[in-house]
Regions:
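Carbohydrate transferase catalytic cores enriched for Leloir-type hexosyltransferases
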Residues: 1-422
C-alpha cells in the first residue's frame, strides 16, 4: 500500500515533476505509461472480503506488481509542457521521452526481476541519466531464517548488483539506513551516496470508508494487520489470547482479528488455529482486506498489535496511531521509529511480559482512555504529501545537477541527442 499512496501523492502534489514508466523489452528497458494505468494497477490489487473466514491461498504480492511502475522525477525546467505520461495511455520508449535532468527512481521493491541490475545498467549507459532507489529493508539478507529457502541468495544477487548503480539511495527509516550502510561496508560495496531517510506517511489519503465485516462489533476486537507469516509473530498473539481465555472471563476478552492473507512458514500456527476452532471463535481472519475495509477495521477496533521480529518501517503501527488507536508493538528495529512514544512496547520473544501488557490494557479501561487522550493531544500523523515532498526535495537537486552537467559537458555519456523533442 505504501507505494500506491506515494504514487498518488506525487501526482497530486507534483504533476509537472513526475511521470511513470514500466519494464519493457525496448531500447532503454522502459516505456512511458499513464498515471491512469498506474492507478488502475494499484486499484486492482485490492481484493476485499466481506465475510470473516479462515484465509487460504497465497498472499498478494503488492510490491512485486507495483514495483514494475517506476517513477521518472522531472524538474520543471526540463519540461516544455506537462508530462504526457499523466494523460496518455502507453507511450514511447524512455529513450524517446527522457531529457537531460530526468532522474529514474524506483520506489517499489524490484527484487522479483532477476534482470533488474542489467536493465538499470543498460538504461544508465544508454541515457546518461541518474538512478535512485528507495530501500524498504534488507531483511532477507540479515534474517534469512524468516524466508523460504532460496529467497536470500536471489535477493542478495539483486541488491548487490543494484546498490552500486544507485546515484541516490533513500530509506524509510534510520534502522534501514543503518542496515544498508553496514551491509554494504561488510560486502565492500561502494555506495554512490549515503542513504537518506524520508518520512513515511500514515493513514489513507484517499479515504473510502467501508463497513466492518460481519461478526465484528465496534470496540470489541483487537486488530493485527499484516500478512500472516513467521516474521510478523502472529504466534505470540495467538499464545497471548489463549492465555487470556484461560485466565479471564470470556466476555472480558476482545476478539482477536488477523487482517491479512496467509503467507509462509506458519503451518503450525494454522493447525493450532484450526484445532482450537479459531480459539472458540475468539479469533477471526479477514483475508486481504481492501482499503475501505481496512480503514473500517482500524476505526472501530479497541486497540492494535504489531509484534514483528524485524521491520524496515512498520506501516501498521503508524496507521494505527493515525486512527487514534493505541498499538501494542514490538520494541525491535525500526518499529519504535514508527510508533514514537505512543505505543506500548513489548519484547517479541517474551510472551509472558507481552501477555501482562495486553492483559493490563484489557482490564484497565481508564488506562486505555488515558493513552488515547495523550495520543489525541500530542500525535500528528505524517501525511503522504509530506512523503512525496521529501522525495522530490531530496532528488531534484540530483536531477538539477545532472542537467547542469549535461548543458556544459555534452559528452557521449550525456546522450543529449537522444532526449531532444522533435
Amino acid at each position: 500500500r505504501l507505494t500506491g499512496e506515494v504514487y498518488a501523492a506525487l501526482v497530486n502534489r507534483h504533476p509537472d515533476k513526475v511521470g511513470f514508466v514500466r519494464h519493457a523489452d525496448v531500447p532503454g528497458g522502459f516505456i512511458v505509461v499513464s498515471w491512469q494505468d498506474v492507478l488502475a494497477t494499484y486499484r486492482s490489487l485490492a481484493h476485499g472480503h466481506d465475510d470473516i473466514r479462515p484465509a487460504s491461498g497465497q498472499v498478494t504480492s503488492w510490491h512485486a506488481i507495483l514495483s514494475r511502475l517506476m517513477k521518472d522525477i522531472r524538474p520543471r525546467s526540463a519540461r516544455q509542457s506537462p508530462a504526457p505520461s499523466l494523460t496518455a495511455s502507453s507511450g514511447p520508449a524512455i529513450l524517446e521521452a527522457a531529457e537531460p535532468g530526468d532522474l529514474l527512481c524506483t520506489l517499489g521493491a524490484p527484487w522479483h526481476d532477476a534482470n533488474y541490475e542489467a536493465r538499470v545498467a543498460a538504461f544508465k549507459a544508454a541515457t546518461g541519466l541518474r538512478f535512485a532507489i528507495l530501500i524498504h529493508d534488507l531483511i532477507p539478507l540479515l534474517r534469512p531464517e524468516y524466508f523460504d529457502l532460496g529467497r536470500a541468495p536471489h535477493f542478495e544477487r539483486v541488491i548487490a548488483g543494484i546498490l552500486p548503480l544507485a546515484d541516490a539511495i533513500l530509506t524509510n527509516s534510520k534502522a534501514t539506513a543503518h542496515d544498508v550502510s553496514t551491509w554494504a561496508d561488510r560486502q565492500k560495496i561502494m555506495l554512490g551516496s549515503a542513504p537518506r531517510v524520508i518520512p513515511i506517511g500514515a493513514g489513507f489519503d484517499r479515504p473510502t470508508w467501508g463497513s466492518l465485516p460481519a461478526g465484528l462489533n465496534t470496540g470489541e476486537y483487537a486488530l493485527f494487520v499484516s500478512t500472516i507469516e513467521v516474521r510478523k509473530n502472529h504466534q505470540q498473539a495467538f499464545r497471548i489470547w489463549s492465555q487470556l481465555l484461560r485466565e479471564l472471563p470470556r466476555d472480558q476478552v476482545p476478539k482477536l482479528v488477523f487482517a491479512g492473507g496467509w503467507g509462509w512458514m506458519v503451518e503450525d500456527l494454522r493447525k493450532a488455529i484450526e484445532a482450537t476452532n479459531h480459539l472458540d471463535n475468539k479469533l477471526a481472519i479477514v483475508s486481504s482486506p481492501d482499503d475501505a475495509t481496512l480503514a473500517a477495521l482500524y476505526r472501530e477496533c479497541r486497540f492494535t498489535l504489531y509484534l514483528s521480529y524485524y521491520e524496515g518501517w512498520g506501516l501498521p503501527v503508524s496507521d494505527s496511531l493515525s486512527f487514534g488507536k493505541i498499538c501494542v508493538a514490538s520494541e525491535r528495529t525500526s518499529i519504535p521509529e514508527a510508533g514514537s512514544r505512543f505505543c506500548l512496547y513489548v519484547d517479541p520473544d517474551n510472551t509472558t511480559a507481552a501477555y501482562e501488557t495486553v492483559k493490563n490494557l484489557i482490564s484497565s479501561p481508564n488506562m486505555l482512555e488515558q493513552l488515547e487522550g495523550e495520543l489525541r493531544d500530542n500525535y500528528t500523523p505524517t501525511s503522504w504529501t509530506t512523503t512525496a515532498d521529501a522525495i522530490v526535495q531530496t532528488l531534484l537537486p540530483e536531477a538539477e545537477s545532472m542537467k547542469a552537467r549535461a548543458e556544459f559537458d555534452p559528452s557521449p555519456g550525456c546522450a543529449l541527442a537522444a532526449f531532444r523533442r522533435a
